Amino acid sequence: MSRNIVKILDKGFSDISAGEKMLISSPEKISEFIFKIPKGSYLSIKSLRRELALKAGADNTCPVTTGIFLRMAIEQNKDDVKFPYWRVIDEKHPVVKKLKLDENQIKKRRVDEGIPS
């Protein structure tokens, strides 16, 4: 399901305050976003959450669902050599072990693009 849901929070949650708009994205939307990250660029998960939210008219993206959906997006696209997940995670990110990704390959791709570890 490739849709965004925006909710106004009654109570603060994580780094999102009460009254702010919180985006609940999807694996598909996160995949689309990662595909568009330019070569040589790195985006932290926090920055990814903020940018996804702003594009959807929200203040921030839910950190819990972002983690889940990021893992799903990487899992669904990990065999696509054009899917640049290494621009969002480094070889030390917990999802690397969960999905049995090649740490050395991630490191090499980041070095090749000039992305610091």
Name each region found by the language model:
Residues 1-2:
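N-terminal organelle transit peptides
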Residues 5-117:
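Nucleic acid-binding interface residues in structured DNA/RNA-binding domains
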